């Protein structure tokens, strides 16, 4: 159990006389990776709305058929996160976004970010680079977690050097880098804490890449291909050759992914981390410190990021986070109980508080003394107990139930806080029942009952992964934000949550 309690004196630079954030960032250019994600979208919106004097450079991976700039337009600017800014700007919204946003095609899983000469020239003009791109799932395949979370920060720093960018790199990590260890985790770089690991990150990268290659090779052996084809035929019956081939290949790819997920979980546990996400983030911090080669670095470590408290509006969220699959499956009657210690702390932090802290760190600039760390979490100052969360959820869905297909309210049960094994068994039984039902109506088009079963199965698969990858309790930290300016925009005091 880790208590990520920040040192109260860690950031003595906070002064009332320091210029306000908006003034400090006026006229700056800020590059952001991971802008299409949950945190990245919120960060882009807040910079554009709250810091009118800044410009943004979004480093975005192009889709198979979608250029990077079009992805920004579709996936970021059309998100409901921007409803408030769109209303404020009215007819000027599109023109203002074109004026203030540059888009360069880049990918943190590639050396040099895959930037071309134009991209490097644009990156050179940036005063700050916020690296928020990450493989955030607790159960990411080992190789993808390594390429994105471990090597991503080092690639960003290297790309900055290659481009001649002398700006400040803000790397978003996680409070869980301390792993499943006991004791306070201070706001310090990992080598200066009791939680430093001796694992050789270069060896871990090489091993993960070998494992991907070896696992893929095994999946293509005659016995494995025969097994996948047999399963595909069992599911599809007398389907034609193209459908059978496509299903066989999907089963092969799924098998490879599952093997790499299990490998990531096992390797993380062997080194003292709860999952591949925390393990690769921790090694990513270490790799960045070793290879930054003069790039000024600040690390921001949030806990579990959840929906907004106030900005851009209360409750705003994008996609399934950690809590939503559990809450939804409970409300649907798919999950009768969930493992946990009643008095344990569920350390979640609203996304707008994380955004506020990152912007404040950007305004503060790098610490001349060297790499620094800011932890952004709620557990130390405003702890949410697991029992309290469960009670609140149950009371809400008792008063505002979901309804089944017959129009009847779904009654939610009492949670008894059982062990993880019992809940895993319950979830797998529910999954097996749904799979049997899916086979019985497999001839139906994907609508009606089959669509409902597919939806329920997707939720159950997510919840099962969460049960298996439950992070350690009581990962607690404080937000150390270096400015007081514009509190209405940059509030990050956990007591206000």
For each feature predicted by the language model, list its residue ranges.
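N-terminal low-complexity segments that are often proline-rich with Ser/Thr-Pro
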Residues: 466-496
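A catalytic-pocket lid/entrance helix-loop region that shapes and gates access to the active site
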Residues: 76-78, 182-216, 313-334, 338, ...
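A conserved pocket-lining segment of Rossmann-fold NAD(P)-dependent short-chain dehydrogenase/reductase
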Residues: 141, 242, 258-275, 303, ...
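N-terminal Rossmann/SDR dinucleotide-binding element
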Residues: 2-135, 142-147, 153-154, 159-168, ...
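Conserved cofactor-binding/catalytic machinery of classical short-chain dehydrogenase/reductase
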Residues: 151-155, 283-284, 350
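Conserved beta-loop-beta element that borders a ligand/cofactor-binding pocket
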Residues: 222-262, 269-276, 282-315, 367-373
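Mid/C-terminal beta-alpha module of Rossmann-like enzyme folds, strongest
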Residues: 361-471, 477
């Amino acid at each position: 159990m880790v208590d990520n309690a920040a040192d109260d004196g860690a950031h003595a630079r906070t002064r009332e006389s320091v210029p306000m954030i908006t003034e400090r960032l006026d006229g700056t250019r800020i590059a952001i990776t991971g802008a299409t994600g949950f945190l990245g979208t919120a960060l882009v919106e807040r910079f554009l709305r709250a810091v009118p004097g800044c410009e943004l450079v979004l480093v975005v991976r192009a889709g198979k058929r979608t250029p990077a700039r079009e992805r920004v337009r579709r996936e970021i600017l059309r998100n409901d996160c921007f409803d408030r800014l769109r209303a404020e700007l009215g007819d000027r919204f599109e023109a203002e976004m074109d004026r203030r946003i540059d888009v360069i095609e880049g990918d943190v899983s590639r050396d040099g970010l895959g930037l071309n000469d134009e991209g490097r020239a644009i990156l050179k003009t940036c005063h700050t680079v916020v690296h928020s791109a990450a493989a955030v799932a607790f159960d990411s395949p080992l190789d993808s977690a390594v390429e994105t979370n471990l090597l991503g920060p080092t690639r960003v720093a290297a790309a900055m050097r290659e481009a001649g960018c002398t700006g400040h790199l803000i790397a978003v990590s996680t409070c869980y880098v301390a792993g499943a260890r006991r004791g306070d985790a201070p706001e310090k770089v990992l080598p200066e804490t009791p939680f430093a690991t001796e694992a050789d990150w270069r060896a871990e990268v090489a091993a993960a890449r070998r494992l991907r290659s070896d696992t893929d090779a095994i999946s293509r052996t005659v016995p494995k291909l025969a097994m996948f084809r047999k399963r595909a035929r069992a599911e599809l019956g007398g389907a034609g050759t193209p459908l059978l081939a496509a299903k066989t290949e999907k089963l092969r790819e799924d098998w490879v992914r599952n093997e790499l997920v299990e490998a990531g979980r096992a390797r993380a546990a062997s080194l003292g981390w709860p999952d591949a996400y925390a393990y690769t983030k921790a090694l990513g911090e270490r790799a960045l410190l070793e290879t930054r080669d003069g790039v000024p670095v600040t690390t921001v470590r949030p806990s579990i990021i959840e929906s907004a408290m106030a900005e851009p509006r209360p409750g705003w969220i994008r996609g399934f986070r950690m809590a939503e699959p559990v809450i939804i499956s409970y409300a649907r009657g798919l999950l009768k109980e969930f493992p946990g210690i009643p008095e344990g702390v569920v350390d979640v932090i609203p996304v707008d508080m994380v955004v506020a802290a990152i912007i404040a760190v950007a305004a503060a600039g790098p610490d001349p003394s060297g790499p620094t760390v800011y932890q952004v979490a709620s557990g130390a100052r405003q702890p949410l107990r697991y029992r309290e969360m469960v009670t609140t959820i149950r009371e809400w869905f008792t008063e505002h139930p979901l309804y089944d297909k017959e129009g009847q309210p779904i009654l939610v049960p009492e949670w008894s806080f059982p062990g993880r094994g019992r809940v895993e068994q319950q979830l797998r039984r529910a999954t097996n029942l749904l799979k049997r039902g899916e086979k019985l109506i497999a001839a139906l088009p994907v609508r009606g009952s089959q669509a409902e079963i597919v939806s329920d199965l997707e939720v159950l698969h997510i919840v099962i992964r969460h049960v298996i990858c439950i992070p350690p309790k009581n990962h607690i930290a404080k937000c150390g934000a270096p400015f007081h300016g514009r509190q209405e925009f940059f509030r990050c005091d956990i007591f206000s949550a």
